[in-house]
Amino acid sequence: MNYPHPIIAREGWPFIAIAAVVALLIHAVGGFGFAWPFWLLLVFVVQFFRDPQRPIPAQPNAVLCPADGRIVAVETAQDPYANREALKISVFMNVFNVHSQRSPVDGAISKVEYFPGAFLNAAIDKASTENERNAVVIQTASGKTVTSVQIAGLIARRILCYVRAGEPLSRGQRYGFIRFGSRVDVYLPLGSRAKVSIGEKVYASSTILAELEQ
């Protein structure tokens, strides 16, 4: 699958432009001795908004990781967006991770639901139910329901979602972005087999999060 997005996310272009202009102006006025912190800031902003292509596993029943980060939860929990008990796997993204979100499975979107909320530390459990969040519920061709939830964090105050109910999604397809540290919860049917453990570092699209029961 071709990756139809620039390696530096469009969401970051305005921030990069501002950081570059500030660094150039200060460099022109005061030289590198005064400007180096602003050049360093520019490097940080560029790396934050990187959005590289990732290999996508071909395994048909695989649930792919929707985001870069670290696993903070693997547990049975209530999926409030699909009204069921489910296997919940949570990925926490710090400010150094790639912050685009990608579809964990192939399927059709049955629901997209946004909830305003707080901005607690996204690494803690209650962020799942109390923070600002956006849920995308996906139905696979085999009738499985997979819910992917973007959750804002302590610093992240902007959730971007580019898909709507009724649209198709392909595994690994980019569908959203959260700025400056956040979390993604994935709810899977009971019987799915988790392939990751708490504390494990994971990568969007290339890490297999779980396997759906066949």
UniProtKB/Swiss-Prot annotation:
The modification Pyruvic acid (Ser) is found at residue 182. InterPro entries: PS_Dcarbxylase (IPR003817), PSD-A (IPR033175). Binds 1 pyruvoyl group covalently per subunit. The keyword tRNA processing does not apply. Pathway: Phospholipid metabolism; phosphatidylethanolamine biosynthesis; phosphatidylethanolamine from CDP-diacylglycerol: step 2/2. The record marks 181-182 as: Cleavage (non-hydrolytic). It comes from the Bacteria. One of its GO terms (biological process) is phosphatidylethanolamine biosynthetic process. Its cofactor is pyruvate. It is an enzyme of class 4 (lyase). The active site is at residue 182. Its EC number is 4.1.1.65. Is synthesized initially as an inactive proenzyme. Formation of the active enzyme involves a self-maturation process in which the active site pyruvoyl group is generated from an internal serine residue via an autocatalytic post-translational modification. Two non-identical subunits are generated from the proenzyme in this reaction, and the pyruvate is formed at the N-terminus of the alpha chain, which is derived from the carboxyl end of the proenzyme. It is a peripheral membrane protein. It is found in: Cell membrane. GO terms for cellular component: plasma membrane. Belongs to the phosphatidylserine decarboxylase family. PSD-A subfamily. Heterodimer of a large membrane-associated beta subunit and a small pyruvoyl-containing alpha subunit. Catalyzes the formation of phosphatidylethanolamine (PtdEtn) from phosphatidylserine (PtdSer). PANTHER family: ARCHAETIDYLSERINE DECARBOXYLASE PROENZYME-RELATED (PTHR35809:SF1). This is Phosphatidylserine decarboxylase proenzyme. It comes from Burkholderia cenocepacia (strain HI2424). The gene is psd.
